[in-house]
Amino acid sequence: MKKIFATLAIAVFASSVFAASVSASEITGDSSGTSSVSETEECVLANSTDVYHFTAKAGEETMVMVIGDGDTDLDLYIYDENDNLIDKDVDSDDTPICTWTPKWTGKFTIKIKNLGSVRNYYTMWVY
């Protein structure tokens, strides 16, 4: 419960601090096509991974935050354009958060992995 409240507080704070960190006007996702930079609502199937791609600017702190529906554990992974793992949140919950500062402007990949046996509806924010 504490993490949910902390996540919501971070979302409110981050919307004012990190809103300009992503340079792309859209995030492209393998699961649903195209969606808004600031907020994406989606469903990841049981034991599956949703994948998104976006461009982030060098030197600007970037945050990806996911809040699931509470049914399963969601893990979050961030990769750079060379497929190097940049950050991950693999806690046993469905509210993962990753924050990093890119060393160069480039393409990044977001992977949201559902470890459960049922689907999970989630909202993702990129700041």
Predicted ranges, named:
Residues 1-7:
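Positively charged n-region of N-terminal signal peptides that target proteins for export
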